UniProtKB/Swiss-Prot annotation:
The keyword Transcription does not apply. PROSITE patterns: CARBAMOYLTRANSFERASE (PS00097). GO terms for molecular function: amino acid binding; aspartate carbamoyltransferase activity. Transmembrane segments: none annotated. Its EC number is 2.1.3.2. It comes from the Bacteria. This is Aspartate carbamoyltransferase catalytic subunit.
Length: 308
């Protein structure tokens, strides 16, 4: 049987991405469709989450599915030493699809290989976050009217930021120019720069973050420095406040510029930016509902024709 899991966005073709965005668009028109009546969605969060977990659960509820799962692994048998394989096999007895976030890179891939039901990767360590990428792509498409030939500036934690890794891979189909803005300690890992070269993705690296650097951006994708990924807290203290976006920095930017952030923010976007028409991060989070409805339907075999 075909495995319909969503482990990485790299497995999606250009056509598949555009198809998924069209599904999300239909759900934005009407999110209350009982397409998953009688289905059970399990949300297994081995790492903290607010937006991802709640938007997946809301997506499932609005589609008529029931939701089971946990948001704190300490309250489960994994705290007693149960293996990931056993947890996945056990939950597969109860659910039609498993949405999983895990602190280990590769955990979602492993789960998809042992589970008899589809796995949706809701983040695996610093590796991938494909459902976030789907809502990011939808947000970019909605605000720019296209995914083609855009200048996309990725700012902050590019080393541990799984959202920027996934976005980079997804955009390979659309001829972007990336600008990687990060301190030395958090720059884009070599493997992703090699990926860019292999797929003819243009990129420029910066360590400065100022008005001049960002003036040609179509998308400014801010990220927080992730304290939980650091083994050396002194290193975290050195870089945590390195880039802060302030409203005055936007004065000479393009009129079509939109600021995205996977959230939560800490202090990398000043609150005075919230009032700018270029700030889009809260609407971006709302788009997560529609993108995740599309993902749940797709992995469960529901097509665009079923919802038109």
């Amino acid at each position: 049987m075909e495995n319909r899991s969503l482990v990485t966005i790299a497995e999606h073709s250009r056509e598949k991405i555009l198809y998924m965005l069209e599904m999300a668009k239909q759900f934005e028109k009407n999110p209350n469709r009982r397409l998953l009546e009688g289905k059970v969605v399990a949300t297994l969060f081995f790492e903290p989450s607010t937006r991802t977990r709640l938007s997946f659960e809301t997506a499932a509820n609005r589609l008529g599915a029931r939701v089971i799962g946990f948001s704190d692994p300490k309250a489960t048998s994994s705290s007693k030493g149960e293996t990931l394989k056993d947890t996945i096999m056990m939950v597969s007895n109860y659910a039609d699809v498993i949405v999983m976030r895990h602190y280990l890179e590769g955990a979602a891939r492993y789960a998809s290989e042992v589970a008899p039901v589809p796995i949706v990767n809701a983040g695996d360590g610093a590796n991938q976050h494909p459902s976030q990428t789907m809502l990011d792509l939808y947000s970019i498409y909605k605000t720019q009217g296209t995914l083609e030939n855009l200048n996309i500036y990725l700012v902050g934690d590019l080393k541990y930021g799984r959202t920027v890794h996934s976005l980079l891979m997804a955009m390979r189909h659309f001829n972007p120019t990336f600008h990687f803005i990060a301190p030395e300690e958090l720059k884009m890992p070599e493997e992703y720069k090699i990926y860019c070269k292999e797929h003819n993705i243009k990129y420029v690296e910066h360590t400065d973050f100022n008005e001049e650097v960002i003036k040609d951006a179509d998308i400014l994708y801010m990220t927080r420095v992730q304290r939980e990924r650091f083994t050396d807290l002194m290193e975290y203290e050195r870089v945590k406040n390195v880039y802060i976006l302030k409203a005055k920095m936007l004065e000479n930017t393009r009129s079509n510029l939109r600021i995205l952030h996977p959230l939560p923010r800490v202090n990398e976007i000043a609150y005075d930016v919230d009032d700018s028409p270029k700030a889009y991060y809260f609407q971006q989070a709302q788009n997560g509902l529609y993108a995740r409805q599309a993902i749940l339907c797709d992995v469960l075999g529901i097509t665009l024709q079923d919802i038109l």
